[in-house]
C-alpha cells in the first residue's frame, strides 16, 4: 500500500481538526511576546529562564497550545566562535495556556556574551535574536555584586508582607542573649540547630544537637547567595527541624528570640524562609531533581475538560487526617481517590487501609481536584500543587510557608476544615460549579507562578538576612567551634569576575 505524501497528510489532519470544531490557530512569530530574567546577562541563576506568549496574526494572545507539534525552539550559543561552552537547552515547556517556559543551564561562563535565538519553525520570534553582552556568569562563579544593584537587576519586590510581620516581633536582636539561650533551650541531643556567621561574605557554622544533616540544604543556598551578592555581616540560628521553635509571647518576659525556620505557625515567632525543598529543587533543576518550580509548569497533565472529576491525594501517614482521607475515599470512591504510600507513624493501620502504589508527581494532575493536607507541619508539596492547573482544596492549618500570606481562600484555592468534615461537600460544589472551580484553579496557578519564580526566592532570602542584620545590637563574630563552609570546587569552569570593572580609559 502506497504511503500518502506528507503535505497531503497535513491537509487531511487540518481538515479533521476543523471538522472536529478545533480550527488551527495560526501563530504570528513577530507579534508573539518574549520576556523574562533569562534574557539579562546580569541575572545569575542556576537555571536561567524566560517566557513566551504565542500571539496570532490579529494580535490576540493564544489561550491554548497551537495545534500540532509545538514548533517553538530555542538556540543558545556563545557570541564568540572561540568560546566553546557547555549549555544545556531542553525543549520549551508548554504551559497549555498559550504560554511557554524556556530554560537553559550554563556550565561555564562566557566572556564575550550569548546569542539567544527563539524560533517558530525557521522564523525568529518577537525581537529574536537576543544578545546578552558578556560576561555571562554560570552558577558557580563567585562574583558577588553590590546589593542595591543586584536587587534592582532581579526586580526584587520592595516589600514582602511576611518578612515585615516576622520582624515586627524583633525591633532589635540581642546576639549575646541568643548566644546564652539557644544552646540551652534548643541545642540538646535531640536538637537540629545550626549556628551561622556570615563575615566578609564568607559562611561559617557550627552544629548544635544531633540531627543536623539537613545543614547541607541551608549551606547550599547561603553559598549560592554569596556567589551572587555581597551579604551583610550577621550571626543567626537556623532550625533544621520540622516544627517552629520559638513560642514565647511578643511582650512576654523573657522575650522571644528570632530563630530562622522553613515553616511558621500561628503560635510561634520563628522567622520563615523558603523551604529547603523548593530551594534545593531550584538549585538542582535540570540536573539532580525532576520536580522543580519550572519543570512542573510544563507537566500539568490533561486540559481541564479532560481531567478526572475526582479529588486526589497520595502521601505518607504523617498526620491522622491523611488516614481519614483514605477512609473517606473507600466510602466515596466516586468523589475521592486517596491513598497512603508509606506507613511510619500509624503502622498498625496499614492492614485496614491498605498501601497505595507510588505515583509520579506529574500524574497527580490527571485529576481535577488536589487535596492538600498537612504532614508533620505544612505539606511541602503545596507550592508544586499550586503551580499545576488542578483546583487545590487546602486544609485549614496553623502552619504556613513564606508565600501563604499572598493567597486568598476562594480566590486562589478552596478551603476545607481542619477535620475534613466539609471535604466531600466542597468536592460536590466544585463538580456543580465547574467554571468557578476552573477560574479559582487558574487564579491560584497564576499567583503561584509569580510568587515562586526562582529569582524571587533569592530576593526573599536576601531580604530576610538584610532585615536581620539591620537589627543586630552587636557585631557578629566567628565563634569557637565554627568552621568555614567552602564553596564547591568547580575546576572545569573557571571564571574571572570582570563585569562592571572600570576600563583603562576611566581610570
Curated annotation (Swiss-Prot):
Its EC number is 2.4.1.-, 2.4.2.-. Filamin repeats lie at residues 24-134. GO terms for biological process: protein O-linked glycosylation via serine. Pathway: Protein modification; protein glycosylation. The keyword Transferase applies. SUPFAM superfamilies: E set domains. Keywords: Endoplasmic reticulum, Glycoprotein, Glycosyltransferase, Signal, Transferase. One of its GO terms (cellular component) is endoplasmic reticulum lumen. Pfam families: Filamin (PF00630), Glyco_transf_90 (PF05686). GO terms for molecular function: EGF-domain serine glucosyltransferase activity; EGF-domain serine xylosyltransferase activity; glucosyltransferase activity; UDP-glucosyltransferase activity; UDP-xylosyltransferase activity. Glycans are attached at residues 61, 306. It catalyses: L-seryl-[EGF-like domain protein] + UDP-alpha-D-glucose = 3-O-(beta-D-glucosyl)-L-seryl-[EGF-like domain protein] + UDP + H(+); L-seryl-[EGF-like domain protein] + UDP-alpha-D-xylose = 3-O-(beta-D-xylosyl)-L-seryl-[EGF-like domain protein] + UDP + H(+). Residues 1-20 form the signal peptide. Transmembrane segments: none annotated. A motif (Prevents secretion from ER) lies at residues 504-507. It is found in: Endoplasmic reticulum lumen. It is an enzyme of class 2 (transferase). Protein glucosyltransferase that catalyzes the transfer of glucose from UDP-glucose to a serine residue within the consensus sequence peptide C-X-N-T-X-G-S-F-X-C. Can also catalyze the transfer of xylose from UDP-xylose but less efficiently. Specifically targets extracellular EGF repeats of proteins such as NOTCH1, NOTCH3, FBN1, FBN2 and LTBP1. May regulate the transport of NOTCH1 and NOTCH3 to the plasma membrane and thereby the Notch signaling pathway. PANTHER family: KDEL LYS-ASP-GLU-LEU CONTAINING - RELATED (PTHR12203), PROTEIN O-GLUCOSYLTRANSFERASE 3 (PTHR12203:SF18). Belongs to the KDELC family. This is Protein O-glucosyltransferase 3. It comes from Homo sapiens (Human).
Amino acid at each position: 500500500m502506497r504511503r500518502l505524501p506528507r503535505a497531503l497528510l497535513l491537509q487531511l489532519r487540518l481538515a479533521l481538526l476543523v471538522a472536529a470544531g478545533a480550527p488551527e490557530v495560526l501563530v504570528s512569530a513577530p507579534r508573539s511576546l518574549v520576556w523574562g530574567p533569562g534574557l539579562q546577562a546580569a541575572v545569575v541563576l542556576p537555571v536561567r529562564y524566560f517566557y513566551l506568549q504565542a500571539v496570532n496574526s490579529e494580535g490576540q494572545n493564544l489561550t491554548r497550545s497551537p495545534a500540532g507539534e509545538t514548533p517553538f525552539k530555542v538556540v543558545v550559543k556563545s557570541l564568540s566562535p572561540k568560546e566553546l561552552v557547555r549549555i544545556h537547552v531542553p525543549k520549551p515547556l508548554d504551559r497549555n495556556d498559550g504560554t511557554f517556559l524556556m530554560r537553559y543551564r550554563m556550565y561555564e561562563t562566557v566572556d564575550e556574551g550569548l546569542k539567544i535565538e527563539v524560533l517558530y519553525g525557521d522564523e525568529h520570534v518577537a525581537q529574536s535574536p537576543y544578545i546578552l553582552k558578556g560576561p555571562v556568569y554560570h552558577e558557580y562563579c563567585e562574583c558577588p555584586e553590590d546589593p542595591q544593584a543586584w536587587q534592582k537587576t532581579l526586580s526584587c519586590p520592595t516589600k514582602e508582607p511576611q518578612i515585615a510581620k516576622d520582624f515586627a516581633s524583633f525591633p532589635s536582636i540581642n546576639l549575646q542573649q541568643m548566644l546564652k539561650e539557644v544552646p540551652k533551650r534548643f541545642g540538646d541531643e535531640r536538637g537540629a540547630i545550626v549556628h551561622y556567621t556570615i563575615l566578609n561574605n564568607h559562611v561559617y557554622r557550627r552544629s548544635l544537637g544531633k540531627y543536623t544533616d539537613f545543614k547541607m540544604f541551608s549551606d547550599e543556598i547561603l553559598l549560592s547567595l554569596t556567589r551572587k551578592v555581597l551579604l551583610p555581616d550577621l550571626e543567626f540560628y537556623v532550625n533544621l527541624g520540622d516544627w517552629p521553635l520559638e513560642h514565647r509571647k511578643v511582650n512576654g518576659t523573657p522575650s522571644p528570640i528570632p530563630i530562622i525556620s522553613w515553616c511558621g505557625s500561628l503560635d510561634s515567632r520563628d522567622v520563615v524562609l523558603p523551604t529547603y525543598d523548593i530551594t534545593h529543587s531550584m538549585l538542582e533543576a535540570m540536573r539532580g531533581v525532576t520536580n522543580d518550580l519550572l519543570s512542573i509548569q510544563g507537566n500539568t497533565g490533561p486540559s481541564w475538560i479532560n481531567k478526572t472529576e475526582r479529588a486526589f491525594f497520595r502521601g505518607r501517614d504523617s498526620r491522622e487526617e491523611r488516614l481519614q482521607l483514605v477512609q473517606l475515599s473507600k466510602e466515596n470512591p466516586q468523589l475521592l481517590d486517596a491513598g497512603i504510600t508509606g506507613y511510619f507513624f500509624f503502622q498498625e493501620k496499614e492492614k485496614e487501609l491498605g498501601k497505595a502504589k507510588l505515583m509520579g508527581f506529574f500524574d497527580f494532575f490527571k485529576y481535577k481536584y488536589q487535596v492538600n493536607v498537612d504532614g508533620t507541619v505544612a505539606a511541602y508539596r503545596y507550592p508544586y500543587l499550586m503551580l499545576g492547573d488542578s483546583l487545590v482544596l487546602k486544609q485549614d492549618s496553623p502552619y504556613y510557608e513564606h508565600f501563604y500570606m499572598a493567597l486568598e481562600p476562594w480566590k486562589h484555592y478552596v478551603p476545607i476544615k481542619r477535620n475534613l468534615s466539609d471535604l466531600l461537600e466542597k468536592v460536590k460544589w466544585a463538580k456543580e460549579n465547574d467554571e468557578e472551580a476552573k477560574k479559582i484553579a487558574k487564579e491560584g496557578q497564576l499567583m503561584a507562578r509569580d510568587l515562586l519564580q526562582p529569582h524571587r526566592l533569592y530576593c526573599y532570602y536576601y531580604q530576610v538576612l538584610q532585615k536581620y542584620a539591620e537589627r543586630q545590637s552587636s557585631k557578629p563574630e566567628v565563634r569557637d567551634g565554627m568552621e568555614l563552609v567552602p564553596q564547591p570546587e568547580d575546576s572545569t569552569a573557571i571564571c574571572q569576575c570582570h563585569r562592571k570593572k572600570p576600563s583603562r580609559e576611566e581610570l
